Amino acid sequence: MGITVRNLHKRFGEFAALDDVSLDFPAGELVALLGPSGCGKTTLLRVIAGLEHADSGQVVLQGLDVASVGARERQVGFVFQHYALFRHMTVFENVAFGLRVKPRRERPSEAAIRAKVHELLSLVQLDWLAQRYPSELSGGQRQRIALARALAVEPKVLLLDEPFGALDAKVRKELRGWLRRLHDDLHISTIFVTHDQEEALEVADRIVVLNHGRVEQVGSPQAVYDHPRSAFVYEFLGAANRLDGTVSGNGFVAHGAAQAIAVDADFAGPARAYVRPHDLELAAPYARAQGIAADVRRVVRLGGSVRVELAARSGEVLEAELDRNAWRALALDVGDALTAVPRAVRVFPAR
């Protein structure tokens, strides 16, 4: 089922949680709502679910405006960050709960409920835990049970509020892949909230970047990462080096630098340039005409890669990331001088 929201506004006192938000969520897509704390992503999810009501605007499900319809009538499944399982119920009873509390005329038979629960527990690969209690499960297992419970009532839309936020990094990474595979099997329209850029880039079909209650950008993970429309999106979607300077006909000239860097810009004047650490090439001093003179300040070895912190002569602190073989070939150490050459630079007007 597709979802459309139009001109949503929601305030909490003086704080604008949603400021004229309009979005389309096509049927069958897995969409990430991504942004920093307080950007409005959870409020938007709760408004779609019917757990929160917008001050104005429309929420359209299956062609009907449901802005004034309660959560129960919207046929959405909601999974919270902190599981919300019933502690006094077994895994089986938790998953069966939504089916057993349906009105009598809609409630399946007990045999149908048992079959459905076992089907869902098999789907989340936890059928062997049916008679356990939540306190006997790991965090990752609890979250999968919470997802099975949400799916039991066959929702038209699945809404996930930072579903892996309370889990450790290793379990989060495993569950991200599992969620993507599950979605590929079920093709249920899914919207999930996250502040984890890597999670959104890895799992989602599309990403909606929010900031201060407004939509900054919508697009595929690759499009949003490679072609950010604003400095905010560039900085939020991963590690970024920032250089202040000026754009002219010759390119971008960083403050304190002698040489211009070739850039694709449709404006001139004060600017901020951004380059990813993996797009900052390191070379011997004066080896390149287009480059930034810097000194090695710190070296951090991260498994197969090396992160190099640089002190630019212009005063900025930069970060480069390269593989161990490339770093070894440079034969540099802390305190050594070098030239940092940006390979891919994005510039935005300075504000």
Curated annotation (Swiss-Prot):
Residues 3-237 form the ABC transporter domain. It holds the Pfam family ABC_tran. It catalyses: sulfate(out) + ATP + H2O = sulfate(in) + ADP + phosphate + H(+); thiosulfate(out) + ATP + H2O = thiosulfate(in) + ADP + phosphate + H(+). Transmembrane segments: none annotated. It comes from the Bacteria. Its EC number is 7.3.2.3. One of its GO terms (cellular component) is ATP-binding cassette (ABC) transporter complex. InterPro entries: AAA+_ATPase (IPR003593), ABC_SmlMolc_Importer (IPR050093), ABC_transporter-like_ATP-bd (IPR003439), ABC_transporter-like_CS (IPR017871), Mo/tungstate-bd_C_term_dom (IPR008995), P-loop_NTPase (IPR027417), Sulph_transpt1 (IPR005666), TOBE-like (IPR024765). It is found in: Cell inner membrane. It is a peripheral membrane protein. ATP binds at G35, P36, S37, G38, C39, G40, K41, T42. Keywords: ATP-binding, Cell inner membrane, Cell membrane, Membrane, Nucleotide-binding, Sulfate transport, Translocase, Transport. CDD domains: ABC_CysA_sulfate_importer (cd03296). Belongs to the ABC transporter superfamily. Sulfate/tungstate importer (TC 3.A.1.6) family. Part of the ABC transporter complex CysAWTP involved in sulfate/thiosulfate import. Responsible for energy coupling to the transport system. This is Sulfate/thiosulfate import ATP-binding protein CysA. It comes from Burkholderia pseudomallei (strain K96243). The lineage of its organism: Bacteria, Pseudomonadati, Pseudomonadota, Betaproteobacteria, Burkholderiales. The gene is cysA.
